[in-house]
Amino acid sequence: MGQNDLMGTAEDFADQFLRVTKQYLPHVARLCLISTFLEDGIRMWFQWSEQRDYIDTTWSCGYLLASSFVFLNLLGQLTGCVLVLSRNFVQYACFGLFGIIALQTIAYSILWDLKFLMRNLALGGGLLLLLAESRSEGKSMFAGVPTMRESSPKQYMQLGGRVLLVLMFMTLLHFDASFFSIIQNIVGTALMILVAIGFKTKLAALTLVVWLFAINVYFNAFWTIPVYKPMHDFLKYDFFQTMSVIGGLLLVVALGPGGVSMDEKKKEW
């Protein structure tokens, strides 16, 4: 009974949090979600020559193609961020940002680095949720018009987004025998499964937001490293990519799990 009371209290807190923040939570979620693209686009501007030289050296593609790659990254990411934040042509912005992820995955050889590949896939999951949200906003203009129960593409995008988001947490698991690591892995894995299958989704996603934010601030504190050290850029990249996944989880909290989830199926039972 005590355990049920604790779970009930936690769910009440999550519902209360959502009621208080429902006006601005989607805005915060979108800002967090695009933060890695915004930071990377700005970095392309300030590190133009370094990025160009890296691409030229890695792919031997020449000055012109390397410069075009950097320009495409800069323009594509900053334009996509502006469109998402202004809620204009959000679907096109998402497709453009998907393209940037794919381009960077190949150009920076992320395809062969499992950890970074999983984080890029998690970032793609956040964009899928943003795409689903934009479809919801588009359909809301036709409120009252008879439609099917729910758009299948939208609910499957939400499912795919949830599943991809949890890949981020698989990169945080620690495979050692310490008591703290074992507890952290058990709790983290349980929360990941809950989000993926859509059970107690808002509470599980909100808990993961708090946990991931704490880990991010502790392990990726780039502001404590001098700017001239390579570790500064590495931690900054990691920090903002993690913030983007947090943004995706906040979208799950704000929008719910969608039609393909245990929470929705419970309503039919």
Curated annotation (Swiss-Prot):
One of its GO terms (molecular function) is cargo receptor activity. This is Surfeit locus protein 4. One of its GO terms (biological process) is positive regulation of organelle organization. InterPro entries: Surf1/Surf4, Surf4. It comes from Mus musculus. Keywords: Endoplasmic reticulum, Golgi apparatus, Membrane, Protein transport, Transmembrane, Transmembrane helix, Transport. The keyword NAD does not apply. The keyword Zinc-finger does not apply. The di-lysine motif confers endoplasmic reticulum localization for type I membrane proteins. It is a multi-pass membrane protein. Belongs to the SURF4 family. Its main location: endoplasmic reticulum. Disruption phenotype: Embryonic lethality between 3.5 and 9.5 dpc. Conditional deletion in the liver depletes plasma lipids and protects mice from atherosclerosis. The gene is Surf4. PROSITE patterns: SURF4.
